[in-house]
């Protein structure tokens, strides 16, 4: 599995942390110790890693925090602190405080990548490497490394699935995440580009509205769309947790047999729905394990180490995790990857 492989790559460390004042004997001993650490995953220099995330107010973000904490706890040489922000302004203030505390690295899943770019750049300028998760900063200078899912490809794969199911004819609704962030824009653009390529004008996009990744907002938005449209063939949603509200609206209206729905994220609730068959036809894995991988990357960078499976001595600047489509055909096989 590509997602598991990406996560596995960042778990083990390799490096050569020699001191220029060491004697030749000491240098040889250091090199031998480094080689042993490469093979066994032994601890290195103790580092302090801070993580800043948005409110963990739905399942995926809750798992982001949990996976980051789990990864940090695997290492005896990591001191870890996670802070949650109420909004983008609060997060910027929190990161400024973290900069003043001088951790060895900061992991950031920004509330809004563009708005948080200046403070991330400040951290980098202060010599604190930043690992960017999920929502991109506005400039590459704001992070030493970035790990994210391929949001554009989620849109592409959803378009391919819906185009096939509808035979490129029908009415589609798109329920987006948070307006203006890179995740939403990429998922929307990937879908738009692919559906146009495959179907031309055969698919009519009836509505396209954000619901902020929240189930309650999904319910409200979908209720209004259902009232305004008598014939809907498919719903492309950006998030499985948000889709719980969307599904509730459709079922409350008694219209679940009229349409199909695709999600994104890989929640266990979505897996259950897909296994049952009917309305919820597919989702796309966008695993919160990337937060754990981000902590592992931050550890390697802070310790000046690289990744054992790569020839290059430094951690790559970008890791993109491809989405995996989940349907009735493979839901049982992929169930270990879902999140509660």
What is the predicted role of each segment?
Residues 114-153, 164, 171, 267-275, ...:
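Flexible loop/hinge segments that line or gate small-molecule binding clefts
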Residues 108-125, 191, 207, 211-272:
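Hydrophobic alpha-helical
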């Amino acid at each position: 599995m590509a997602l598991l492989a990406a996560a596995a790559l960042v778990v083990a460390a390799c490096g050569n942390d020699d001191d220029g004042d060491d004697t030749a004997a000491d240098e040889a001993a250091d090199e031998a110790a480094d080689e042993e650490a490469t093979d066994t995953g032994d601890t290195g220099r103790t580092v302090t890693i801070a993580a800043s995330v948005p409110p963990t107010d739905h399942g995926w973000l809750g798992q982001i925090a949990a996976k980051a904490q789990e990864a940090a706890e695997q290492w005896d040489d990591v001191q870890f602190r996670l802070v949650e922000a109420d909004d983008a302004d609060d997060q910027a203030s929190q990161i400024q405080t973290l900069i003043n505390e001088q951790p060895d690295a900061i992991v950031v899943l920004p509330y809004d990548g563009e708005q948080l770019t200046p403070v991330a750049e400040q951290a980098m300028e202060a010599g604190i490497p930043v690992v960017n998760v999920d929502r991109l900063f506005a400039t590459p200078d704001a992070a030493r490394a970035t790990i994210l899912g391929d949001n554009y490809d989620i849109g592409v794969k959803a378009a391919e699935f819906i185009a096939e199911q509808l035979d490129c004819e029908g009415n589609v609704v798109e329920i987006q995440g948070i307006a203006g962030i890179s995740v939403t824009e990429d998922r929307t653009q990937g879908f738009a580009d692919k559906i146009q390529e495959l179907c031309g004008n055969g698919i009519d996009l009836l509505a396209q509205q954000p619901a902020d990744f929240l189930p309650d907002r999904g319910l409200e938005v979908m209720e209004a769309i259902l009232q305004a449209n008598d014939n809907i063939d498919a719903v492309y949603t950006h998030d499985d947790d948000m889709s719980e509200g969307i599904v509730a609206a459709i079922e409350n209206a008694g219209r679940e047999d009229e349409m199909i729905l695709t999600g994104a994220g890989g929640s266990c609730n979505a897996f259950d729905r897909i296994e049952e068959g009917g309305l919820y036809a597919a989702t796309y894995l966008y695993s919160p394990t990337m937060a754990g991988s981000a902590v592992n990357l931050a550890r390697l960078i802070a310790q000046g180490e690289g990744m054992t499976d790569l020839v290059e001595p430094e951690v790559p600047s970008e890791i993109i995790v491809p989405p995996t489509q989940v349907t009735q055909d493979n839901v049982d096989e992929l169930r270990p990857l879902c999140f509660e």
